């Protein structure tokens, strides 16, 4: 019988979470040898993954938000290990988990430890890996709230422009995207490059993305002058602009902008004038629901731990 052994790497803020304590106790009663380690500062997740693998663990549970999940997923992929990952979503947005159908209730999420893992892709850019999505919004100043008027107009892209209170504050950047049989150049307001489907707390920028197809979904919100100039009339007419996105599905895409680009990788900032995004097919083994919307039919791996 395969030894049921795992390590839960838990964000330090969740140390006193009674639901987590109860769920861990339940898994131990079910026969799991489940160790728990806490993160305290930047770099801890990566260090704890290394320690877990060195100790012989082949199953890691990521307990935290999208940032914690990204850190642990990246560390596992860079270790080139066959160890698998269970997602325990404890953050505010939990964008990848929600899109993947992972339960938000702690005990139900940990039930996925007992299902077979699936091979899923990662995205890579600038030497960094991401599980969910790379996003970019231009001319935005991030604060706590987004104008309700802008939300009505921008729909799923609204969170990229957090802090804008007037239409005159919308600014675009000139960008060029190139990939296999794909080329687009122009002014853009927003960009999503997704392995997952949503970002910013439930905004579906890449609504049909699959995490196991070896491809990245590209969503561009163009900003020709006539579009920027008519946002107010779009609002008055009750129209959103989600349907104005240009979309593609590519194994890689190069993004260039002489103005520089501010990119968010599941909470990790990245900037540059010339960036290449690539899919890393099957780079991670994740325990997901059999009916996860992010799975397109790739075969199950032959074990749960």
Curated annotation (Swiss-Prot):
Positions with a binding annotation for Mg(2+):
210, 213, 215
Where in or outside the cell it occurs: the entry states:
Cytoplasm
- Which cofactors are reported in the record for this sequence? Mg(2+); Ca(2+)
Enzyme Commission number: 2.7.1.-
Give the top-rank taxon of the lineage listed in the UniProt record for this protein: Bacteria
- How is the cofactor bound here? Binds 1 Mg(2+) ion per subunit. Ca(2+) may be able to substitute.
Chief location of this protein?
cytoplasm
The keyword Magnesium appears for this protein? yes
Q: What is the protein's name according to its record?
A: Probable lipid kinase YegS-like
What species is this protein from?
Pseudomonas syringae pv. syringae (strain B728a)
